[in-house]
Amino acid sequence: GDICECGVFKGSGFFTWVKLMKIFKPNSDSKVIGFDFFENKSKPKFKYKSDKKVLALHNKDGISQKDLFKKCEEWNFKNLKLYAGDVKKTTKKYARDSLGSRIALLYLDVDNYEGTLEILKNLYNKMAKGGVIAFDEYALQGHGESDAVDEFLSNKKIKLKSFSWAKTPTAYIIIK
């Protein structure tokens, strides 16, 4: 399956996924897919103050799509796709347009309630059996990710797990 990162920002996580894909699945058709604003100027209008605060902190200095593609070309990695804009809309478009594809790893790093909840609604059914959804800011004060995850999982029999030794990701689930 594909690796999807929601919240690419400066690209360090995205480049890690690309390198791991090259090492462990060099002949695979699986893609590394990134969702972020990139150069797109349309920003979401959040209801919650904490979400607005987090967006303001991350509203600058992210990597451009051009630079991300250029670096991946240098590494001879072409199995990537980028979606620019509001993740609430772009993840919905991806889910609609990627018939038959599955996600092996979904990494959520959007830092906010509304985006996290919509990503889970849009992409959960695209997850492969045995796939992993990892949460970068679960249980961190000032980020709405925890509330969104708890709300989404409230009617599902899924147990959240964590690494006691890791600062991030703070939680993950394995799809059965």
Feature map (PLM): residue ranges:
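S-adenosylmethionine/decaboxylated-SAM
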Residues: 1-176
